[in-house]
Structures are given as structure tokens and as C-alpha cells.
């Protein structure tokens, strides 16, 4: 049981265990500074068996039989949840892995060997033969995909099909597993009686059911209906011997109903227990004991009418409402994890709530409310909280309800700086496309200026760039110049538009050159976009949205013929592709060509896997260490990249390395350098340093490669370069040594040339 206080731990036969009695008191009795916990051994090997049933009720009926087989986990989901996922395009391919049925159990077994785990699963398959469709998964990748389907439950149920918001309030009730089938049937009847609809899923092995229901919490009538429903639901769960909360706790939303479950005498005992620890009742008042009413002190409440300011982004996924977007966060705190995944890199360094996705979303909510935050778009607490946001978009991909702080940050900064000058680095880094075009006319002079000791330091100060940060060198010949000087493949071949982004055009042209070679090997005629076009990705980091929209409008206007023909656009830089797939349609939600371009834009690996039919990926039997760009993982998805590497025969380890810490321009800023390197040192940089010389290090993001090069002394390859390497069937040269030698010679020549020019100018001045 999770509801109430576990006073049974104070009984003599339980050893009067105070620590265990405090578990679940929700901060109402004491503040826990540290705790010693017991850990259960994790099985070395696992197997996943998925059982399909005609409906979720019959799946629940079989829980006792399933649990007798000794699984280490048993999760359930219904057809409503799967339909919600398909509607919202959440793991649409992964849901196809489910066996036939309209209700499913995901049953996991463990063992010291794979054979032992599989044997347990097969024994259960034999027991349920004929009663359920079943599928045993032996592929770890497929197993991971199915667990992601289950984990996406909250995100898939946060909105109904018509956009109506759903709420917690009756989200984790639990009953004894033997009673689960009966409870679910009667709970569905209760939902129907009140006119509510929701998916049913959760930890069925423990009898815990998760729901999010479309309560109307903004009108008096809706709130009264909510109260009646929750009261009836509490009676139902108690009648089945269950608990109001099986996982999340009571808080305010259920505590008023605890007498229904425990009786008045035990509830008074809860009060006495709290009084011993907290005689002044200052610890989290209004929760668990002597609680607020379930229908008061609501986050929204009757009469809730949030302001709807004019915004650049349309927020189409939130009914075109920034206010609704700021209500996405439901407070679970997934963004406060410290180890796995990417979200949230700045929080992992500072450990401050305001730097978590949850903290930032709540501050924006309070800013719009004007209570308690004042100042609107000029609210300094919001600016401070967003300042360390790396705009990695990990929250959009990993947050269960897809809070998108990167977009909120860009919107906020556009208003915060309206009519005001931005910091120096905003102009240095945000306008990098313009500076790069200028520098490409005289790359030698630009490189000398940015790397000559005294001059480089002065220029970095002017641009707000950290003096410790190494600045990438401009290529002596841009990719565009190289491309325009060569003959393309026969015009009869299928045409693709390779997006020559700022970074791979002006700094790393070898990446784009490799992509051309690979695409032509796959049988495509390659073209590139007109020179003036740039997606404007760096502009978002500084809220330069007027300029960003202008850049995207140019793209739509210039590419309309290509869009109309359905020409695929292939990108190399994940953040640029993400701009087309994400920001563009939020800035131009009613432009049909923007929607078409979103569907026609691919990352190179996606295009080769999905569109290069009949092409066989070149083999390269090597080991590889792979770091995924944040936008690649959160917006685009990393499956295609992994599939391409698999087809190549690479023994590739995809690192759970989080964010590299560079995050575009973030790591270049003077004030952000230390936190940038701290983020990189958490996982990525140590692994990169330890990477054996014969193992390929792969990173598609330009900023990721820059961070690894400076922080680990290794030069990663883009997947395009790895493909070209495979095509040429030879080992890569040593990029670091070759580039340094070339740069030393070039630098010496440039220095001599500039010195000659300077001396000549001095002589002319004197003779004049």
C-alpha cells in the first residue's frame, strides 16, 4: 500500500522500524537527508513475452496465472492507449510489434543465462496456449522498442483526440491482482456513467492502473463533477480491497478520501504520528493528514482564463496556445534523473530545480499568470532559469508529456530582447552564416586572425567567446565551390537536394563531399540549395525569431518548385534537419509547403534506409563508438542511423552519453564554457578518450565533433565519412596529425604574407 502512513512498521513484530514508517509520508513528518536502501540483484539476462487478449479485462483476469510463473515484471495496456499512440505518431512502428489483440501483457523474465530466461517464458506460453496470442522476443532492440511503447503511456494520454487536456486525480489506484479484472470492468462502467474516456494501462502485476481523465477543472460544474467521480471511484477501489494510490502517493488529490479506506480511528492515528514529528504542523501542510479538500487550491480552478499573448511560434500541438503549452508539465520529475538519457543536461550540473524541465515550465506558467511572478516577458527569474537551457530538445523527446523548453526559450528571448540589444555572443554566433560567408572569401586571413595569440583573444572578447574555446578553422575551399566545379551524375537519375548547411559548407566540406559520393553510389543525382538559403538554426538560441522566420520564408519561396516535385531534401547536420521537421511548421502552421517540406526532409541515414531501395550499404567490419546529436535523438529518432550501421556490418556501440555540452553555440559563450565542459566530462569525453585507436568514433553533429576534438583530442567522423570509407575499402588516415601539419604550414605562410603586407603599408605611409 502507498496510501496513508505505514504504521504497521511500528508494531513489535516489525521491530518498531521508524525509517520504514517514514517511507511514503510525503515530507509531512521529516526531511530525509540520506537513506540506506537494500538492492535486489538485477538478472544478467532477460526475455520479454508479450501476450495479446481480446480485451484488457481478460488480460487482467490472467494476472494471477501469469504471476505464478515468477516474472520480474508484468505491465498491461489496452487498445485505447495504442490507438492514442498511433494518432499522435508516438512509436507508430513499434506498436506493430504487438501480437494480435486489444489488450496486452508485457511479461519479463530474468535468469543467469538467456536460455534460463527463455525457458521461463516458454513455460508460461505453454500454460496460456489457446487463451492468448503470444510473441517471445529474443532481439534486445525489439524488446527496448516495446518497453518504450509502455513508457510512452503518459505522453500518449496527455490529450484526447480533439485536444482536450487530461488530468491526474485518479491516476494510480491499485487493487489486489486477483481482483484486477473485476475492478477494470466496473471502473469502465463508472467512466461511461460520467461520460469520461481514458486508456487503461499500468503495473498490472501489482494491480496498479494508470489513467488520465478529461476532468473539467475550470468551471464550477466541472469541478463538482470531478469531486463526485473521484468519490465514487474511491468507493469502488475500496470495495475491491484496494488502495487509493498504488504508487504516487496521496498528496492533496486523494487524502481527503483516506477515511473511506482506513476509517476515522486510523486516520486519527496518522494525525498523532505526524504531531510527534511535526508538532507545529509546518511540514508540507494540507497533505495526507488534515488535508485540503480535493476540489480546492487547484492549479487552474473555476474562472481560469489565462492570457494569450501574441507569439512567433503557433504551438499547433497545444491548440495554438502558449498558455496550454506551459500546462504540459504534470510534475513527474523525469527531468531530474542523473544517469540515463539526455534530459536535462544543465540540471545534472547545477542540481537546481529551476534548471530542470519541470522548473522552467512552471516558471513560464507562473509568468503568464502574473502570480507570483511579475514582469511578464521581462521577468528576470524566467530569464535566469532559461539562460542555462542548452536548447538540446531532450525534453521534447524524453519528457513523458513532451515539454519543449527549447521552443519556449526562443519565444521568451524574442520578447525579452524586443527593442533591446542582445549580448555580444548573440550577434557573433547567431549570425554565423553571414560571418562564415564573409570569411570564406579570405579563409587564410580569417584563420590567422582567429588563431594568432593576441588578436584571437581580442576577437573572442569582442564576440563574447570563451578564451579557452578553440575556434574551428574555415575551409580553404567551401563545399559549394567544390560541388560547382565538378560534373554531377547523369540527369536521368532520381534527384535529391543535399542541404549544404553552414557548418559542413564553410568548415567541414569533406563531410558534404563524402555525402555526395555516397548518394551518387546509391544512384541519385545530387543538387544543392541556392547559396543564400540557410535554415537559421543558431538564431533560435538567441530568440532572433523575426530573422529566423525570414530565413525560412526564403527557403519556402525558393524551393517551392522542388517541394511541388516531391524532391527529397537530405541533410547532414541534425539540428538543421530538425528545424525543417519541427520549428518550421510551428512558425508557419498553415503553409502547406512547409508541411510537405517537413515530410520530404531526411537525415542522410534516414534517406538511405527508407528511400534508397535496391542499394546495398557498403560493408565495413570495424568497431565503432557512436554519439548521437541531441536533436537527432529527440526530434528525428536514432533508429535509422543504428539500422544503417547494422547493415554496414559495424560492431557499433551507441553511447548513452547524454548531451556533449557544446549544444551549438552554448559551449562557445564565455560564461558557459565551464558548464559546457562539465557536461561533456560526465560521460562522453571520458569514453572518447578511452576509445581504442582502431575503433571508429562517429558523431554526426558539428558541435559534438568540436567538443570531442577539444575535450578528448580525437576527431570523430560523420556517418557520411564512414560510408565513404567503406566504399573506398581502406582504413582512415590520421585526421588530427594531418590537419595540424597542414594548419602549421598554412599559418606560417599566412603570417609571413600578412607581415609583408603590414611592412609594405608602413613603408608606403612613411614615404607618403
Annotate the PLM regions.
Residues 77, 136-139, 158-162, 247-249, ...:
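Short coil/turn segments at secondary-structure boundaries
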Residues 45-49, 168-170, 217-222, 252-261, ...:
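Short beta-alpha connecting loops at secondary-structure transitions
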Residues 255-263, 272, 276, 386-420:
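Repeat-solenoid scaffold signature
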Residues 43-49, 102-110, 164-175, 210-218, ...:
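Glycine- and acidic
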Residues 1-202, 207-246, 250-339, 345-346:
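Noncatalytic alpha-helical scaffold of FAD-dependent oxidoreductases
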Residues 278, 285, 406-768:
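Iron-sulfur cluster-binding electron-transfer modules in prokaryotic oxidoreductases
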Residues 120-122, 134-137, 144-200, 221-234, ...:
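Non-catalytic terminal/interface segments that mediate subunit docking, oligomerization
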Amino acid at each position: 500500500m502507498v496510501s496513508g502512513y505505514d504504521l504497521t512498521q511500528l508494531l513489535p513484530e516489525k521491530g518498531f522500524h521508524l525509517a520504514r514508517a517514514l517511507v511514503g509520508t510525503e515530507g509531512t513528518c521529516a526531511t530525509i537527508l540520506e537513506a540506506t536502501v537494500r538492492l535486489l540483484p538485477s538478472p544478467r539476462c532477460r526475455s520479454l513475452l508479450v501476450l495479446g487478449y481480446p480485451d484488457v479485462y481478460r488480460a487482467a483476469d490472467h494476472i494471477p496465472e501469469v504471476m505464478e510463473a515468477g516474472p520480474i515484471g508484468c505491465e498491461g495496456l489496452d487498445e485505447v492507449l495504442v490507438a492514442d499512440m498511433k494518432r499522435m505518431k508516438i512509436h507508430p512502428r513499434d506498436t506493430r510489434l504487438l501480437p494480435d489483440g486489444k489488450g496486452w501483457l508485457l511479461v519479463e523474465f530474468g535468469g543467469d543465462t538467456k536460455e534460463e530466461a527463455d525457458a521461463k517464458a516458454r513455460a508460461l506460453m505453454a500454460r496460456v496456449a489457446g487463451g492468448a496470442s503470444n510473441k517471445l522476443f529474443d532481439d534486445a532492440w525489439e524488446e527496448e522498442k516495446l518497453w518504450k511503447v509502455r513508457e510512452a503511456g503518459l505522453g500518449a494520454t496527455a490529450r484526447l483526440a480533439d485536444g482536450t487536456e487530461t488530468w491526474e486525480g485518479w491516476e494510480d489506484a491499485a487493487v489486489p491482482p486477483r481482483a484486477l479484472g473485476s475492478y477494470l470492468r466496473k471502473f469502465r462502467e463508472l467512466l461511461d456513467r460520467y461520460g469520461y474516456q481514458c486508456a487503461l494501462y499500468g503495473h498490472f502485476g501489482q494491480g496498479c492502473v494508470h489513467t488520465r481523465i478529461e476532468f473539467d477543472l475550470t468551471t464550477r460544474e466541472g469541478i463538482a463533477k470531478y469531486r463526485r467521480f473521484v468519490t465514487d471511484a474511491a468507493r469502488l477501489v475500496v470495495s475491491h480491497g484496494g488502495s487509493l494510490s498504488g504508487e504516487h502517493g496521496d498528496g492533496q488529490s486523494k487524502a481527503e478520501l483516506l477515511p473511506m479506506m482506513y476509517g476515522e480511528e486510523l486516520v486519527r492515528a496518522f494525525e498523532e504520528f505526524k504531531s510527534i514529528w511535526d508538532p507545529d504542523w509546518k511540514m508540507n501542510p494540507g497533505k495526507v493528514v488534515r488535508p485540503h479538500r480535493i476540489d480546492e487550491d487547484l492549479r487552474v480552478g473555476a474562472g481560469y482564463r489565462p492570457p494569450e499573448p501574441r507569439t512567433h511560434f503557433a504551438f499547433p500541438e497545444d491548440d495554438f496556445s502558449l498558455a496550454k503549452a506551459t500546462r504540459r508539465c504534470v510534475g513527474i520529475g523525469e527531468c531530474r534523473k542523473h544517469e540515463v538519457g539526455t534530459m536535462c543536461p544543465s540540471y545534472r550540473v547545477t542540481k537546481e530545480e529551476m534548471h530542470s524541465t519541470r522548473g522552467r515550465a512552471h516558471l513560464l506558467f507562473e509568468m503568464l499568470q502574473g502570480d507570483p511572478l511579475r514582469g511578464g516577458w521581462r521577468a528576470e527569474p524566467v530569464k535566469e532559469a532559461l539562460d542555462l537551457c542548452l536548447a538540446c530538445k531532450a525534453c521534447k523527446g524524453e519528457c513523458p508529456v513532451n515539454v519543449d523548453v527549447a521552443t519556449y526559450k526562443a519565444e521568451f528571448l524574442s520578447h525579452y530582447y524586443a527593442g533591446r540589444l542582445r549580448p555580444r555572443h548573440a550577434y557573433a554566433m547567431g549570425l554565423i552564416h553571414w560571418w562564415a560567408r564573409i570569411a570564406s572569401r579570405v579563409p587564410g586571413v580569417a584563420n590567422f586572425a582567429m588563431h594568432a595569440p593576441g588578436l584571437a583573444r581580442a576577437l573572442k572578447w569582442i564576440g563574447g567567446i570563451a578564451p579557452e574555446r578553440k575556434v574551428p578553422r574555415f575551409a580553404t575551399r567551401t563545399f559549394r565551390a567544390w560541388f560547382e566545379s565538378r560534373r554531377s551524375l547523369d540527369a536521368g537519375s532520381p534527384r535529391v537536394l543535399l542541404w549544404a548547411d553552414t557548418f559542413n559548407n564553410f568548415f567541414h566540406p569533406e563531410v558534404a563531399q563524402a555525402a555526395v559520393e555516397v548518394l551518387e553510389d546509391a544512384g541519385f543525382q545530387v543538387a544543392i540549395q541556392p547559396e543564400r538559403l540557410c535554415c537559421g538554426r543558431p538564431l533560435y538560441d538567441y530568440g532572433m525569431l523575426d530573422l529566423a522566420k525570414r530565413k525560412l520564408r526564403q527557403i519556402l519561396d525558393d524551393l517551392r518548385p522542388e517541394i511541388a516535385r516531391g524532391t527529397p531534401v537530405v541533410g547532414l547536420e541534425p539540428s538543421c534537419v530538425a528545424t525543417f521537421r519541427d520549428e518550421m511548421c510551428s512558425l508557419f502552421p498553415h503553409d502547406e509547403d512547409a508541411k510537405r517540406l517537413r515530410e520530404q526532409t531526411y537525415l542522410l541515414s534516414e534517406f538511405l534506409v527508407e528511400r534508397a531501395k535496391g542499394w546495398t550499404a557498403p560493408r565495413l567490419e570495424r568497431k565503432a563508438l557512436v554519439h548521437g546529436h541531441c536533436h537527432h535523438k529527440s526530434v528525428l529518432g536514432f533508429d535509422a542511423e543504428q539500422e544503417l550501421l547494422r547493415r554496414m556490418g559495424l560492431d557499433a556501440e551507441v553511447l548513452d552519453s547524454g548531451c556533449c555540452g557544446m549544444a551549438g553555440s552554448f559551449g562557445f559563450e564565455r560564461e558557459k564554457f565551464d558548464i559546457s565542459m562539465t557536461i561533456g566530462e560526465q560521460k562522453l569525453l571520458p569514453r572518447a578518450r578511452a576509445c581504442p585507436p582502431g575503433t571508429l568514433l562517429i558523431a554526426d553533429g558539428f558541435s559534438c565533433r568540436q567538443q570531442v576534438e577539444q575535450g578528448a583530442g580525437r576527431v570523430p567522423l560523420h556517418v557520411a565519412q564512414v560510408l565513404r570509407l567503406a566504399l573506398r575499402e581502406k582504413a582512415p588516415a590520421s585526421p588530427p596529425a594531418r590537419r595540424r601539419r597542414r594548419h602549421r604550414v598554412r599559418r606560417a605562410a599566412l603570417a609571413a604574407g600578412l607581415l609583408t603586407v603590414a611592412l609594405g603599408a608602413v613603408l608606403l605611409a612613411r614615404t607618403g
